[in-house]
Amino acid sequence: MESLTLQPINLINGEVNLPGSKSVSNRALLLAALAQGTTRLTNLLDSDDIRHMLNALQQLGVQYQLSADKTECTVEGLGQPFSVKDFTCLYLGNAGTAMRPLAAALCLGQGEFELTGEPRMKERPIGHLVDALRSAGADITYLENEHYPPLKIKGTGLDGGEVSIDGSISSQFLTAFLMAAPLAKSDTTILIKGDLVSKPYIDITLNIMAQFGVQVENQNYQKFIVPAGQVYQSPGEFLVEGDASSASYFLAAGAIKGGEVKVTGIGKNSIQGDIQFADALEAMGAEIEWGEDYIIARHRQLNAIDMDFNHIPDAAMTIATAALFAPGTTSIRNVYNWRVKETDRLHAMATELRKLGAEVEEGDDYITITSPTQLKHVAIDTYDDHRMAMCFSLVALSDTAVTINDPKCTSKTFPDYFTKLEQLSR
């Protein structure tokens, strides 16, 4: 297995222009494909997850032109749901942002489809979404294990009506249903069962739907009303914001070992909830400056915090490694959905932090980290999870080197992450 050893970094300073957001890129690509008109997307993320979505759209008859650097894509909208004559098998790797929304969208049109992916995708639950889609008239069959991909979908249209979705495991189930609902046969009312996790990701979905001309009534995240008969209309141009989850590593680095680090491509008006990571860093003691299209983090002594991170679970992972630099015990609470991500992130994070010498308690939906006085040089296993690799790169901001196993797993969202980190390192 390939590995990368990062030597201790004395100072972090400089500016990073962020790659496009994964969450925004795949939502916008899907809506551009369904929309009337042609959409030019700029600052598109070039990564594995986006490639899986683009390949799927191509198989579904969508025509697009991708620039040489793959960050600009012009999509010819179909102006209607996907319909294919022949049985179509779509391979989606481990891209939840492709699997879940496509599962809902393919119910709308005509044709028979199989949705599958790599082994980890077959361990990531999709039952709550399938239950909701079936209650709206969808014809979906599990091909292997109940409640998990791969799926067989027979497109017959969605009826609409009143539907319940369990929101406690993943907000992507609700996102998927919301994006399909305007094209259902009648108005859809979606009722949320349980506590909805990752609410800011629903805000991203509703914001992008609005940019494509579709309105949804959101009643306090407990009830969503989507009128039928709406049509997605291309906005013409669509700028993909920088990825706020990816910003977290650089902002944390600035807080731990700045100088200062400026990330551009997101700012105080971003539609991504993960910019609230900067507030968590500020709570730990970092100095944060907000601009229209940038955020700056400057070094200050960090302190341990105890916080609920249900709203920003992805960025909360970065707090777990930043906690190594904050004397005391940091508690990251209400993050059960770490367990159903690219890997079981609670278990993976606890295991690797302990290797470094931290004292860790792993609960069902929380983790506490007591920072050690001295970090050990160890090889970090990354579990084929891009965020594990990027989070643990921060260990090099100590006086100890760190070895990252399988560093190329960052290709899921940020293929040149380690190059960018090196450019800021002194």
Curated annotation (Swiss-Prot):
EC number: 2.5.1.19
PANTHER family listed in its UniProt record: AROM/DEHYDROQUINATE SYNTHASE (PTHR21090), PENTAFUNCTIONAL AROM POLYPEPTIDE (PTHR21090:SF5)
Protein family membership: Belongs to the EPSP synthase family.
GO cellular component terms attached to this protein's record: cytoplasm
Compartments in which it is found: Cytoplasm
GO molecular function: 3-phosphoshikimate 1-carboxyvinyltransferase activity
Catalytic residues of the enzyme: D314
Annotated InterPro entries: Enolpyruvate_Tfrase_dom, Enolpyruvate_Tfrase_sf, EPSP_synthase, EPSP_synthase_CS, RNA3'P_cycl/enolpyr_Trfase_a/b
GO biological process, one term: aromatic amino acid family biosynthetic process
Pathway: Metabolic intermediate biosynthesis; chorismate biosynthesis; chorismate from D-erythrose 4-phosphate and phosphoenolpyruvate: step 6/7
Major localization class: cytoplasm
Top-rank lineage group of the source organism: Bacteria
Gene source species: Photobacterium damsela subsp. piscicida (Pasteurella piscicida)
Residues that coordinate or bind phosphoenolpyruvate: K22, G96, R124, Q172, R345, R387, K412
Cross-referenced SUPFAM superfamilies: EPT/RTPC-like (SSF55205)
Record bears the keyword Transferase: yes
Catalysed reaction, written as an equation: 3-phosphoshikimate + phosphoenolpyruvate = 5-O-(1-carboxyvinyl)-3-phosphoshikimate + phosphate
Keywords: Amino-acid biosynthesis, Aromatic amino acid biosynthesis, Cytoplasm, Transferase
Protein name: 3-phosphoshikimate 1-carboxyvinyltransferase
Annotated positions binding 3-phosphoshikimate: K22, S23, R27, S170, S171, Q172, S198, D314, N337, K341
NCBIfam families: aroA (TIGR01356)
Task of the protein: Catalyzes the transfer of the enolpyruvyl moiety of phosphoenolpyruvate (PEP) to the 5-hydroxyl of shikimate-3-phosphate (S3P) to produce enolpyruvyl shikimate-3-phosphate and inorganic phosphate.
